[in-house]
Amino acid sequence: MFERILLAVDGSEHSRKAVPVAGDLSRRYGGEVIVLHVREHEVTWGADIDVETADEARELVDGVVRELKDSGANVRGEVMRVALGQTPRAILDLARDEGVGLIVMGTRGLSDWGRLLMGSVAHKIVHLAEVPVLVVR
């Protein structure tokens, strides 16, 4: 059913909850999980400032990949570096380029505010994705 599943992670508690869900779907349907973490950077006054280091990002992805492999999932990891605010576009572009059938991601808990039901990245992905999106909270 899902030959490729894109698991977008950011290291938060909310995204951690999506990891076992993606692993279960991979094992159940025999699909590959692509673990993606997007590193943002900002250019300010001529300086290029990373929100996190490349090593921190790689460590995050490698940890999730190990966890999913240990649970029997077929998995690989990707780290992308984009300009601040471009994370949704990077996720959607990779999903398209890889022929992903499902995007899995976490979000913060629900609130009473209509547009704030999901984190802004999850909100944009849900509304712009061309494939199903499973949001785990």
Identify the residue ranges that each predicted region occupies:
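Residue-level detector of structured alpha->beta connecting loops
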Residues: G30, G99-G101, E130
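Acidic, proline/glycine-rich short linear motifs
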Residues: L36-G63, Q86, A90
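Short, acidic/small-residue loops that bind anionic groups at enzyme active sites
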Residues: L128-R137
